[in-house]
Design a protein with these regions (language model features):
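Short hydrophobic/aromatic beta-strand or adjacent loop that forms the aromatic wall/cage
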Residues: 128-132
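Long, low-complexity hydrophobic alpha-helices enriched in A/L/V/I and glycine
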Residues: 153-155
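N-terminal targeting sequences that direct proteins away from the cytosol to non-cytosolic compartments
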Residues: 1-90, 94, 109-126, 137-148, ...
């Protein structure tokens, strides 16, 4: 007996305000910031198959310098936020890693820190590095909206009077499969210019 098996693919809808998904055989695309960035020039990897924010100029008015979204899972996002650092010359001027992690967890009800670490971010081509704090938090219930519970990973670096906050998010249910990929993106952030 012959059985006709036809497969159907769910149509992937490009999120409103985002470009069509970009793909790369390496599994990652690379963004080099444009001249309009509010900070120094930088690069960051973002997952293949994801969409890039179309109108970055209007997003910059609220501190978003780049934004990416998984069209198959709208809770999975990656964004670069740039803001004035005031008198801070390093992320350490904001406090210890423990203090910064506690502050991020306290920023929303039912949010807890699930990971934290120090690392270095490359600045320029001469071997200069800046201290970066990575903080991973999980938030549950109403705060995460229709996604139920969610996980957020941020990398925070201060250089040249600017704070660069790289934020990756995913629903808690998709985090186990997204974690390595999103961590790679957060860690790929590099500042291209030095003082």
């Amino acid at each position: 007996m012959l059985v006709d098996r036809t497969t159907s693919r769910a149509e992937v809808m490009t999120p409103r305000g985002y470009d069509e998904p970009e793909t790369s055989h390496t599994g990652f695309n690379t963004l080099r910031s444009d001249r309009e960035t509010v900070g120094r020039a930088y690069t960051i990897e973002w997952p293949s198959g994801w969409c890039k924010l179309t109108d970055v100029s209007s997003a910059r008015s609220v501190g978003v310098d780049a934004s990416f979204k998984n069209p198959r899972d709208e809770a999975s996002t990656l964004a670069v936020f740039i803001s004035d650092a005031g008198s801070r010359r390093s992320v350490a001027d904001q406090g210890s890693l423990d203090k910064v992690a506690a502050s991020r967890a306290d920023s929303a009800p039912r949010q807890v820190t699930v990971g934290k670490r120090r690392r270095k971010t490359k600045v320029g081509e001469n071997g200069t590095e800046a201290l970066t704090y990575d903080v991973e938090t999980k938030v549950g219930g109403g705060t995460a909206g229709r996604f139920g519970s969610a996980v957020e990973l941020v990398g925070i670096t201060v250089v040249g009077g600017k704070e660069y906050l790289i934020r990756a998010t995913a629903s808690a249910s998709s985090w186990p499969e997204e974690r390595a990929r999103l961590r790679r993106c957060v860690e790929s952030f590099r500042i291209l210019e030095t003082d």
